[in-house]
Amino acid sequence: MAAQCGGYMNQSDPGSNSERSADSPLPGSEDDSPGSAAPHDPEWREERFRVDRKKLETMLQAAAEGKGKSGEDFFQKIMEETNTQIAWPSKLKIGAKSKKDPHIKVSGKKENVKEAKERIMSVLDTKSNRVTLKMDVSHTEHSHVIGKGGNNIKKVMEETGCHIHFPDSNRNNQAEKSNQVSIAGQPAGVESARVRIRELLPLVLMFELPIAGILQPIPDPNSPTIQQISQTYNITVSFKQRSRVYGATVIVRGSQNNTSAVKEGTAMLLEHLAGSLASAIPVSTQLDIAAQHHLFMMGRNGCNIKHIMQRTGAQIHFPDPNNPLKKSTVYLQGTIESVCLARQYLMGCLPLVLMFDMKEEIEVEPQCITQLMEQLDVFISIKPKPKQPSKSVIVKSVERNALNMYEARKCLLGLDSSGVTITNQSTISCPIPMNCHGLDILAAGLGLSGLGLLGPNTLSVNSTTAQNSLLNALNSSVSPLHSPSSAAPSPTLWATSLANTSNATGFPAIPHLMIPSAAQATLTNFLLSGVPNYGQNTPSPPPGLTPVDVHMNGLHSECKKVTSVLNGHVKPTNMKYGTISSSSLGDKVLNTNLAEASRQSNNHSSAEEVNSKTDSEGCNDAFVEVGMPRSPSHSANTKDLKQMLNSTKAPCPTRQTVKLLHGTKNSHLHTAERLLSDSEMSPTEGPMTDKKAPGSERAAERAAAQHNCEMARFTSQSAYGNMQAYDYEQKKLLATKAMLKKPVVTEVRTPTNTWSGLGFSKSMPAETIKELRRANHVPYKPTMSTTYENSPMSLSRSNSREQLGNGSDSDNWRERNGIDSSHNDYSSSIGSPKRKQNKSAEHYLSSSNYMDCISSLTGSNGCNLNSSFKGSDLPELFSKLGLGKYTDIFQQQEIDLQTFLTLTDQDLKELGITTFGARRKMLLAISELNKNRRKLFEPTNIRSSFLEGGASGRLPRQYHTDIASVSGRW
């Protein structure tokens, strides 16, 4: 390691070089060693180590100028006080070209040698804070980075205080070229040098001129217009004749640190040369990436490249590995913006190696190393150095994760700071400076910054939905993130930069810095909000549940809230979030009920009595949660919910009110064990699934719910409609079906505001819709219920303008709409929930949660579709199985239900269904449906007649959500 830091190549100890007399101690250069006594003394030791050349030169210079202690005095004092002999290069040439660190030799008894070394290194230490970083830079671009006469790289070395080494082997070896560049110095300087090198890289964009005629001449690069563009945007323009004579290739050259000007100049040139055809001409560029890194960068099944292409819209082509000529050239094609962005993302996937020394006495437990590797998404290797009292540490990762590599070093060495500030982060790793300090490390830990998920395009492309996406992220749970890298997603999130720890070794503090997985899920969804195909696409909450007047400047304040939560409330023992918001809604409403609820936690029979009693009194005791958050970080948004509650005249007497309040109170009720149990939920379960663990907590909440139901029986029920929950999954399914349905030419399509403000549209910006609705003062009223008492086909009891029928207030959908259940077969498939509950009341009440109950009713595999599924479309099937988030994947691949029934496990893997649980559900559903295929596809489909106008066809059509999706009437 020392040799690499000194010479940056694997060299032998420089004992035989020309500077031996100056840089290394010579026998007899100091006082004579203690004769023959040394060999006979078993405790006699000799130790040779390097010291910092610049510090030693400074000491000698200061002594020569009479401004400080001379080297002679310094070493003589140590020899006398420690009873050792020290040999040092007294004739060191000051200002020599050599950058090698000189050696010091200390002889004496073991304890004395150790003490002398510590005293010398306390003044002349060179390696305690020195690191070496190896990065990948295409060998074809080395000369461009170095500059004429080495001017570019010299300037970088001077400004960063680092030594930068380019491989010497490239000069002589024409067959194999090395792309590895080494940077050695202090961590902050090394990271700054890495960023500077990336900025010095050339940026070359190319496009083909359209063929306007056979005899069309190649444009003159010296023409006034082209020269004006070149000078204005600091680019070089050249033309290359194509081999087939007609047309030419335009090559625009610039620098990475001038990216915006290069893009503007290319656009101007394209418009000048192609005119109206400019927008149709693709732009291309290429990257030279070592062939051995291709598979690593592409990811498993090419997932990295697919994500980048989907994110940017550019096409990326990796070469055939068997092509001997251009096996390392990667081609990118698309619009100017997409090509440049994809190029940045690819560079963020390039490998990085960080090397540094660790003291021999520092011991690191293997489990701590494993924990660090998982949390920071890095690889760590620690090996002892031969014949030296130190260890060599190697940390490997990718460029987008550079900050976490320094975090790993900080933790391993027990430092107070990583030595790298956020301002040093590369524009390639993160294309925008982040306003939220706390999210920098979070983004790096999730491996997102390199993919631009926190870049300017996130804010610009998705700015129309940023308001809802932020709140939606904080108000919902997400399935575990599928990391774009081939490594498995880490179960927890590292937040060392968010906590102030000054522990000497750094390792006892590790458990203090672990954020619960529930909070990680919230933060993950916050980071991924608005980004297609990353995480779960949860629809935006309706205006009735979350405020719609949040503006983009609220993003910064929300970031601060999240950061403050993490800073103040990551505790080592019971990770409660009880003090997140002292004025939280749950504190004010439920604090009087908690004690009694806990006393009743073990009285299960009394809870069952209350269940049956409140059912008869109309208080709904279904176990489906309302669409409110469980996340600990939600308490920051309780103010808006309080305002909504205050607008109602009396509290709601239903279980829904209680569960709505529990949504904010859960963060105070549950410990770290409860939070961790949430994170172990199957990734195939939807966000509306009840995720509570079985046991006393369930009993306590149920008892509290029943108590609140009894207390609320005497209050008014006028505000019931305003507090109904909203079934996002069902709405999203119906919207998907409506969008997939082909319009019938002869059918009149009547516009309604059924889908207004829900964010399901894929063609119109949500912000525009909101502005129109605000301008027209159109209020939003929820139109569906999520309770189990109301079937999925239920109509809301709110004041919605779509509500029709006989005006009955009955809980039953058919009774309110005047439809006799005996007339249709489909109604029996969904059944009356009360009948279902009566048939299996014992089983229903003994289940720990809603999903347990449902699985007991449907069968062991959860795919008993004989009577419950008679549809013919894939979205409905996936929604029923809790796999709604995978619907878009199958729609993009144009896979319908018929094709789905032919898929195998391997087919599902190729489609990108990497989660085993999701694939298992799909395969079980395929098996079940294939068994009943003949019955499933019978021509008689009573459901359609039921929806279009009842079994007889004479009932008036009901213009509500379900019919809008099936009949095509909007």
Curated annotation (Swiss-Prot):
GO terms for cellular component: cytoplasm. Pfam families: KH_1 (PF00013), KH_BICC1 (PF22985), KH_BICC1_1st (PF24234), SAM_1 (PF00536). Residues 40-50, 606-616 have a biased composition (Basic and acidic residues). The keyword Phosphoprotein does not apply. Residues 130-197, 282-346 form the KH domain. Residues 869-932 form the SAM domain. Keywords: Developmental protein, Repeat, RNA-binding. One of its GO terms (molecular function) is RNA binding. CDD domains: KH-I_BICC1_rpt1, KH-I_BICC1_rpt2, KH-I_BICC1_rpt3, SAM_BICC1. Residues 9-19, 596-605, 783-810, 819-831 have a biased composition (Polar residues). Coiled coil: none annotated. InterPro entries: BICC1_KH, BICC1_KH-I_rpt1, BICC1_KH-I_rpt2, BICC1_KH-I_rpt3, BICC1_SAM_dom, KH_dom, KH_dom_type_1, KH_dom_type_1_sf. SMART domains: KH, SAM. Residues 1-50, 596-638, 677-696, 773-841 are annotated as: Disordered. Belongs to the BicC family. Putative RNA-binding protein. May be involved in regulating gene expression during embryonic development. Seems to be involved in endoderm formation. Ectopic expression results in endoderm formation in the absence of mesoderm induction. This is Protein bicaudal C homolog 1-B. It comes from Xenopus laevis (African clawed frog). The lineage of its organism: Eukaryota, Metazoa, Chordata, Craniata, Vertebrata. The gene is bicc1-b.
